[in-house]
Amino acid sequence: MSVKDVAQKIEPKMKKCLEAFQHEITTIRTGKATTTLLDRVKVEAYGQQMPLKQVGNVSVQDAHTLMVQVWDKSMVSATEKAIRDANLGLNPAAEGQSIRVSIPPLTEERRKEFVKLTKKFGEDSKVSLRNLRRDMIQDIEKLEKAKAVSEDEKNKGKKDADDLLHKYEKLLMDMITAKEKEIMAV
């Protein structure tokens, strides 16, 4: 195994970390209706907590309205309660076997809370990226101890690990900044 192999093993994990962050922030409200807004909602169904996607279909009706088509009519009230209790600031209204979810405009205070939440998710992702860099450096040091690479190669590998970290931290910061702008846009 070489230093390059170690880097090739770590980089996909860093990409996956950014993808996880991207998925996480899609569930943060921005004032516009998106189906991913309800991704974290869990419904008490058939004696267990199930993701909303497994009890109904979510669609965007217009810029400020989501429609949830519940497949089992007996689950409408439980689904409505789950959306209301999800702490998203939404007020669902049942209409037969469907639930209309109006997306109210965000207050300045709520926008700031969502920006903080975005930054928290970003910080968690930064920690994950740094842990991956640490793992890469440890793997490189193990290679040096096993005499598989020279000290110069080890030092270059450490520099490569730092460069990789900076590349992905910059991408992460760009994603955070874009989401903050999206949240704060009125």
From Swiss-Prot:
One of its GO terms (biological process) is translational termination. Pfam families: RRF. GO terms for cellular component: cytoplasm. Keywords: Cytoplasm, Protein biosynthesis. It comes from the Bacteria. The keyword Lyase does not apply. InterPro entries: Ribosome_recyc_fac, Ribosome_recyc_fac_dom, RRF_sf. It is found in: Cytoplasm. GO terms for molecular function: ribosomal large subunit binding. The keyword Magnesium does not apply. Responsible for the release of ribosomes from messenger RNA at the termination of protein biosynthesis. May increase the efficiency of translation by recycling ribosomes from one round of translation to another. Belongs to the RRF family. This is Ribosome-recycling factor. It comes from Chlorobium chlorochromatii (strain CaD3).
